[in-house]
């Protein structure tokens, strides 16, 4: 959704370093968003698309040259990653870089905290040098009590691995969803929470996104304040 939004609303190029999926999977996902069809569902009994739908989506996505995928599956060394990012920016003119996810970057130490500290410092330095937008995906530590898969609120100290994950970024967004809810509509609803905003200081719940099974798309929906579990400070904002 994010990649599709960027290339549909701007002329900027996006460099994608998705370390947990293949280029084929990434491209198929982008086509699915364009067509509002779940092209990854291949069972004849479950799928609601045809080959013609896929061809049409590819024809419609004329701005596909704005997307650059790194053809790599699995972990990568830090030096290799930094070189790829620099090439995407300097050689291919990408202004947006998406790294998913930071824990897949291999570092020559068994100390995860030290490794992520160094990775984040070097990525931040690269952002300042190149003047780019860098989006980094991070996993979370397990909270005590209710788990994140049951919709527990996310805090900065749950970013897994290092305090630098919270200190160095300009903006930190958390995606919260109760994947175990009995109600299907609630189960497919995601809250976007701003944990850090260096630009204006505004924080708290920012948007609700509803996933639709038929289209596989996310759509922003209004907040229901009666169901909001935010604290008083967040409600005042």
Where is each model-derived feature located?
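Helical mechanochemical/support elements of P-loop NTPase systems and associated helical scaffolds
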Residues: 22-26, 50-54, 77-81, 98, ...
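P-loop NTPase Walker A phosphate-binding motif
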Residues: 1-9
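A structural motif corresponding to the C-terminal end of an alpha-helix
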Residues: 60-69, 126-134, 165-170
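Generic enzyme active-site microenvironment
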Residues: 18, 98, 137, 168
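Helical hairpin unit composed of two closely spaced alpha helices linked by a short loop
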Residues: 94-134
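Cytosolic-facing regulatory segments adjacent to core modules
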Residues: 8-93, 107, 206-208
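C-terminal regions of RecA-like/P-loop NTPase motor modules
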Residues: 42, 76-97, 128-130, 143-237
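Conserved H-loop
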Residues: 19-21, 132, 136-139
């Amino acid at each position: 959704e994010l990649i599709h939004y960027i290339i549909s609303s701007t002329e900027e190029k996006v460099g994608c370093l998705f370390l947990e999926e293949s280029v084929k999977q990434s491209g198929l996902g982008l086509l699915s968003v364009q067509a509002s069809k779940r092209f990854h569902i291949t069972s004849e009994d479950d799928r609601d698309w045809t080959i013609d739908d896929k061809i049409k989506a590819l024809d419609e996505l004329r701005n596909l040259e704005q997307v650059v995928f790194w053809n790599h599956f699995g972990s990568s060394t830090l030096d290799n990653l930094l070189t790829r990012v620099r090439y995407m920016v300097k050689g291919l003119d990408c202004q947006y870089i998406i790294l998913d996810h930071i824990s897949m970057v291999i570092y020559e130490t068994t100390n995860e905290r030290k490794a992520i500290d160094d990775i984040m410092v070097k990525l931040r330095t690269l952002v300042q040098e190149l003047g780019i937008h860098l989006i980094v995906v991070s996993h979370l530590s397990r909270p005590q009590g209710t788990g994140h898969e049951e919709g527990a609120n996310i805090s900065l100290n749950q970013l897994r691995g290092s305090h630098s994950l919270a200190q160095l970024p300009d903006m930190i967004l958390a995606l919260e969803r109760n994947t175990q809810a009995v109600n299907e509509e609630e189960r497919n609803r995601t809250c976007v929470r701003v944990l850090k905003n260096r630009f204006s200081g505004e924080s708290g719940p920012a948007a609700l996104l509803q996933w639709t099974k038929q289209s596989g798309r996310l759509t922003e929906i209004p907040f229901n304040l009666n169901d909001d579990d935010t604290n008083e400070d967040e409600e005042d904002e």
